[in-house]
Amino acid sequence: ITTNAQVDVGSGYAMGFKAGAEPVDMEPHHFHPTGAAFPPAARGRLVTEGVRGEGGILYNKNGERFMQRYNPKLTDLAGRDEVARSIATEILEGRGTEHDAVYLDVSFLPARIIEERLPTMLDDFLDIGVDIRNEPMEVTPTAHHVMGGLRINNRAETNVEGLFAAGEVTGGVHGGNRLGGNALA
């Protein structure tokens, strides 16, 4: 599952590589921990970190708040990489839903809070027949971002004279665990 459109095929990387630009950190890929898994029309839709930030809880098919097992201090607010690995472990060890997912639930929050603080998520899920005010979302780690790209210096220059790179095609900027909201920084 990926959050990326089918037309996102790495053209920027390919153009740079073909011109002789040096790649860096191409092996790490960021998996967003909460991509929609079900219903099928939702697969790959990114479920914003704001859902957990507003108090959303993760639990497996057995109703267990499993993040307490992996990070008892931060639980559902642990870092994205840790949450993604924890969800994957739950699924691989047989505690995921029938759709290879876990539940992310905000239905215990007052409807007004969901409507005011998570309006996009509410609308996105209503469009596919899930009312997050009354039922949980099914989420799974979802391919989201390549951590590497073209190596640049502090002036956005690659090793190819006259070739500059910016945004998601650059590498050596994020490290192994990209911070939220800086994909185009």
Regions found by a protein language model. Name each.
Residues 15, 21-131, 135:
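An anion/pyrophosphate-binding glycine-rich loop and adjacent beta-alpha core
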Residues 117-170:
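A glycine-rich dinucleotide-binding beta-alpha-beta segment and adjacent secondary-structure elements
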Residues 1, 31-36, 143, 147, ...:
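Glycine-rich phosphate/pyrophosphate-binding beta-alpha loops
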Residues 66-69, 113-114, 156, 160-161, ...:
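Short helix/loop capping segments that flank catalytic or ligand/cofactor-binding pockets
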Residues 1-19, 160, 172-185:
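A conserved FAD-binding loop/helix module that cradles the flavin
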